[in-house]
Amino acid sequence: MLYLGLAALAVIIWATCIERYWFAIKRSELKVLPTGSPDLVVLHISDIHMAPWQRYKQRWIRKLNTKVNPDLVINTGDNLGHARGINPVLEALNPLTGIPGVFVNGSNDLYAPAKRNPFQYLLR
């Protein structure tokens, strides 16, 4: 029982103190352009789920322009994680506004995020 409790504590610490700040850029190279064509760098952003208190996430997103130097930005939505997350999302994405891009709404962008019990699916 002690080991189970320690394992649960380790999972909680990992989820709340480490993983939620562990953002990453995944790079993939696709050979789809004709030989000799200049590279096309695409930045795909999705599922930001921004809340107003997530300043670390906001700073990280603001730096994407200089880290990636994209030619095209594709944002596939779910940018909002809180009803007051609109301004933080706009501020975070502001450095990317001069770059051509495409945006698609996610469900969290159309409706205010609702609080849900994360264990509800276990009760079905």
Language-model-detected regions and their locations in the chain:
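Membrane/wall-proximal cationic-aromatic binding patches
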Residues: 28, 37-38, 55, 60-61
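A secondary-structure boundary/capping signal
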Residues: 26, 44-46, 76, 106
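Core catalytic region of metal-dependent phosphoesterases/phosphodiesterases
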Residues: 57-124
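Short beta-strand micro-motifs in enzyme catalytic cores
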Residues: 26-28, 41, 88
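Short, flexible loop segments at the rims of nucleotide/cofactor-binding pockets, characterized by
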Residues: 20, 48-54, 78-82
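Active-site-proximal beta-strand elements of phosphoester/diester hydrolases
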Residues: 39-49
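Proline/glycine-enriched tight loop/beta-turn segments at coil->beta junctions
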Residues: 35-40, 69
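N-terminal membrane-anchoring alpha-helices
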Residues: 1-36
